[in-house]
Design a protein with these regions (language model features):
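Alpha-helical transmembrane-bundle signature of multi-pass membrane transport and export proteins
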Residues: 1-416
Length: 416
């Protein structure tokens, strides 16, 4: 059994005021809190922005275009973001990203108030904000292992998972409420969230990366170096093959379940309640992740979680089109954060600090691309087949991930 190497940054995090629980870790708490606020603002805008475009143009297609442009921009920026996160000072990089997002959403709020929020203005803000978010999130992922002790990595990643599910519960209702009170309020609120995130990152005292001794390589060579390490490491290869189908399966299954319920005549409030149950399952799973990992060796944990998720998703698919399908699917979502926490914490441990950004960028690109294709796949399957056979495609994807986890040398040699 191989043992994950301990980085200088992580080793340094064990001392100097970082002893004790994760909540007592000042720098990690600052980063987590700032991102929690900015993620909340982003979740508000994710709901408010299509509503604004629909109200401005009357075109659902244009409202969808805005979301697609943001998603494509984020995916295109993932690999360059990884190079930046490894080459630049991560703290300054995140501050610059927050400043850009703050300015963009303040400008958009002002444009809404003055009646100048044209589609080109909205698209410009979306492109700039999505690019900055891709860079910020990559730098944040790459920084975490320098802020916490090695034994806290899984808890730190699980806490980030909890943040994601928490804001997905609170953000859309808050965004809808603010949009109803005043169309500019969600965008001005998001600008405020970036200001608070900027202030939090500014106050971080510890280093977010190890010193760079080598001269920076050209962009292309740096990208190739990161991809070569990613594809050449047995565990990281397995992570790619597991994360991409899992992300596609979860995104596609939830989307397909929503469409199937609506086609079956289930009311919109009940469909919304099912979505809330999924998010609650993920939130509770994120809190349970550290305890589950303490009880099982990592290879056993990952393999067991993948097979259990495949079984639960299959049960949900067999109940597709009924509200009862929400129960096994919520249980599957409950397991997701534990798998993510174990996989990404181990990724942070085995990747050298000077490659963290590029490896994270590559993994997020693969997982994000797969998730982006999932709604289109779900819609095409439901257009051709009944809900049960259509949704069974997604547990089949999880089964492929489970087989990888079972057979992969990279998973078998994870640290206990």
């Amino acid at each position: 059994m191989t043992r994950a190497p301990v980085s200088e940054g992580a080793a340094g995090a064990a001392g100097g005021g970082r002893a004790g629980g994760l909540w007592r870790n000042r720098d990690f708490t600052l980063l987590w809190t700032g991102q929690c606020l900015s993620d909340l603002g982003g979740a508000m805008v994710d709901l408010a922005l299509p509503l604004l475009v629909l109200q401005q143009t009357g075109s659902p297609a244009r409202a969808g275009l805005v979301g697609t442009v943001g998603l494509v921009t984020a995916l295109v920026c993932r690999l360059p973001a990884g190079v930046l996160a490894d080459r630049a000072d991560r703290r300054r990089l995140m501050i610059a990203c927050d400043a850009l997002r703050l300015a963009g959403h303040a400008l958009l709020g002002w444009a809404v108030v003055t009646g100048r929020a044209s589609l080109p203005v909205i698209l410009a803000v979306v492109v700039a904000g999505s690019a900055a978010t891709a860079v910020f999130s990559t730098a944040e992922h790459a920084s975490v292992r320098n802020l916490v002790r090695p034994d806290q990595l899984t808890s730190a990643v699980a806490r980030n998972e909890a943040r994601t599910y928490g804001v997905s519960l609170a953000g859309p209702p808050l965004g809808g409420l603010l949009f109803g009170l005043g169309r500019a309020l969600p965008f001005l609120g998001n600008a405020l969230s970036f200001l608070l995130s900027l202030a939090a990152v500014w106050r971080i005292r510890g280093p977010l990366q190890q010193p760079r001794r080598e001269a920076a390589e050209p962009l292309g060579a740096s990208t190739v170096q990161g991809l070569r390490f990613l594809l050449g490491h047995p565990f990281l290869r397995a992570l790619l093959v597991i994360a991409a189908p899992l992300n596609m399966a979860f995104t596609g299954m939830i989307f397909a379940m929503t469409l199937a319920l609506r086609r079956a005549g289930v009311s919109a409030p009940v469909v919304g309640l099912a979505g809330t149950i999924f998010a609650l399952g993920g939130l509770l799973g994120a809190f349970a992740a550290p305890a589950l990992q303490r009880r099982l060796r990592l290879p056993v944990l990952i393999t067991l979680l993948c097979w259990a998720t495949a079984a639960l998703m299959t049960a949900g698919a067999l109940l597709a089109g009924t509200v009862a399908a929400a129960v096994p699917l919520a249980a599957a979502v409950f397991l997701g954060p534990t798998a993510n926490a174990a996989l990404f914490a181990h990724q942070a441990a085995v990747t050298p600090d000077h490659l963290q950004g590029r490896v994270v960028g590559g993994v997020l690109l693969a997982a994000g691309s797969a998730a982006a294709l999932a709604p289109a796949l779900a819609g095409a399957l439901l257009a051709r087949w009944d809900p049960v056979p259509a949704t069974l495609v997604f547990p089949a994807l999880v089964t492929a991930a489970a087989l990888t986890a079972t057979l992969s040398r990279g998973i078998r040699t994870m640290s206990a």
